[in-house]
Amino acid sequence: MSDRMAKFKAGMPKEVIDAMKQEFKDNYDTNKDGTVSCAELAKLMDCPEEEAQRIITGVDVNCDGRMQFDEFLLYMEGYTKERLYSSDEIKQMFDDLDKDGNGRISPDELSKGVGEISTKLVEGMANKLIQEADKDGDGHVNMEEFVDTLVAKLPLCFKKCFHEDFDKNGDGSLTNAEMSQLLNRNLPGQYSEELINEMISRVDLNGDGRVQFGEFLMHAQNLSKDDIKNQFMAIDKDKNGKI
């Protein structure tokens, strides 16, 4: 076991490890061979096999091309590190609101403290973004660092968007009707049936007449880099190329 793995497991309660082991068996290791293959992970995450392979390669300590349970823990460790605030930080925010220290937050305490907490949240988010994205260590984030950092987080954002906002019947794909409903709700009268069909055919890589999440993800990521650059320029008020 690697030092990194030993340290990670040592800091986890046994109940948590047991729960993650059950999650691994029930939802990841679908053929019950004790490992997760690229195909299994791609199916579970509804993503291209290339993306699944990239994830496995990042934690494949024994280089067998599959994800063992200990490697799965490393994968989950990466997700844990992506959380914006730790449990200790959240507890501190609660304590800051709980002025009389009785373990509960009253409406008056919430009203008085929310402005202060909101300021801390915004400052904390900004500081964490700078720390994570500032690859050259100059204390600022340039456009390349900004784009690289946010693009790395896009798949999870797009997955949430796809399933919650687009795929209304929950079948894992977008039909012509779902696309039409979505576009006409947000941009009424701007998209004809013919144009929607053309949009689907451009994204529909497997030719089944529907948009799967993997197809949606590949297309959305291509579009999003320009959007992220535009956001960077909007934030960069003094136009010096850094935030």
Swiss-Prot record:
Q: Where does Ca(2+) 4 bind?
A: 134, 136, 138, 140, 145
Expression sites by tissue: Aboral ectoderm, a squamous epithelium covering the surface of the late stage embryo and larva.
- Binding locations of Ca(2+) 6: 204, 206, 208, 210, 215
Query: Does the keyword section mention Chaperone?
Result: no
Q: Where is the EF-hand domain?
A: 15-49, 47-82, 85-120, 121-156, 157-189, 191-226, 227-243
Task: List positions binding Ca(2+) 5.
Answer: 167, 169, 171, 173, 178
- What name appears for this protein in its UniProt entry? Calcium-binding protein LPS1-beta
Give the originating organism: Lytechinus pictus (Painted sea urchin)
